[in-house]
Amino acid sequence: MPAQEGPPPYCFSTPLRRGVLRSRYRRFFAEVELENGQPVTAHCPNTGPMTGVCQVGAPVYLSYHPDPKRKLAYTWEMIQVEGVWVGINTGLPNRLVEWGLARGWFPQLAEFSRWQREVTCGRSKIDFLLMGDSGLAYLEVKNTTWAVGSRALFPDTVTTRGQKHLEDLIEIRRQGQRALLLYWINRADCTEFAPGEERDPRYAHLFRQALQAGVEVLPYRIAVSPQGIRPLGLAKIVA
């Protein structure tokens, strides 16, 4: 990845392997033809609908982990959609939020120097408890890849878990504590963010309630490429 101003990008520990998506099946599996023509089965870490980001014939990149303890040596990391790389590994965003917190990726969170992962709050586990001289804040992270034009949307299917998280964040605010919701927009071509009302009307309703309650929403645009991953700043919220 070319040198960029600002905080450092995240780079994959080993080179990714390019291929073409041939099929995705049973949610967890993807058939990919590598550049050398070799067919491989890769783990698909995104078990959701993957609306708009699962086109057969599209270029993809896989990570390779030759660990005999693994059932599959390949993991599907990203797909190219209309010229834009989209990250589909749902295991990465939370890890990269923590990685980015330590490296100044998020100016809105710069006041927090310590954090704890997976803290119980209400009926849910919240991804992060942030700690700093100014006090505490709860941070939940949501990954989204669904886009309509330049607008990212979440969710792309009904998510009762996501609804509970919103209710818990609203309750945190009612108790006078800070609550933040970071949407990891796993593609660089979106400049706006909105709740996916078409797919989950209740989530959209709770999202607007959360805004009114003072939950701080941070829809972060993320640039994804085979060379690395970096933040691009906030998208505009369209509620």
From Swiss-Prot:
InterPro entries: SfsA (IPR005224), SfsA_C (IPR040452), SfsA_N (IPR041465). Pfam families: SfsA (PF03749), SfsA_N (PF17746). CDD domains: SfsA-like_bacterial (cd22359). One of its GO terms (molecular function) is DNA binding. Belongs to the SfsA family. This is Sugar fermentation stimulation protein homolog. The lineage of its organism: Bacteria, Bacillati, Cyanobacteriota, Cyanophyceae, Synechococcales.
